[in-house]
Swiss-Prot record:
A lipid is attached at C21 (S-diacylglycerol cysteine). Keywords: Cell outer membrane, Lipoprotein, Membrane, Palmitate, Signal. PROSITE patterns: PROKAR_LIPOPROTEIN. It is found in: Cell outer membrane. The keyword Lipoprotein applies. GO terms for cellular component: cell outer membrane. Its main location: membrane. InterPro entries: Lipoprotein_LppL, LptM_cons. Residues 1-20 form the signal peptide. It comes from Pseudomonas aeruginosa (strain ATCC 15692 / DSM 22644 / CIP 104116 / JCM 14847 / LMG 12228 / 1C / PRS 101 / PAO1). A lipid is attached at C21 (N-palmitoyl cysteine). This is Lipopeptide.
Amino acid sequence: MKRLFLSFVALALLAGSIAACGQKGPLYLPDDEKAKKEHSKDRYGF
């Protein structure tokens, strides 16, 4: 029973850490073409 509980806790922590990944910052839609070009790629240029 203890092993099952520890497995569940480990799975929950793993899922939480994966869900926390992603871009940070405000979400918005750029209004003009210049802003669209500047922000079309992510921060690291991939």
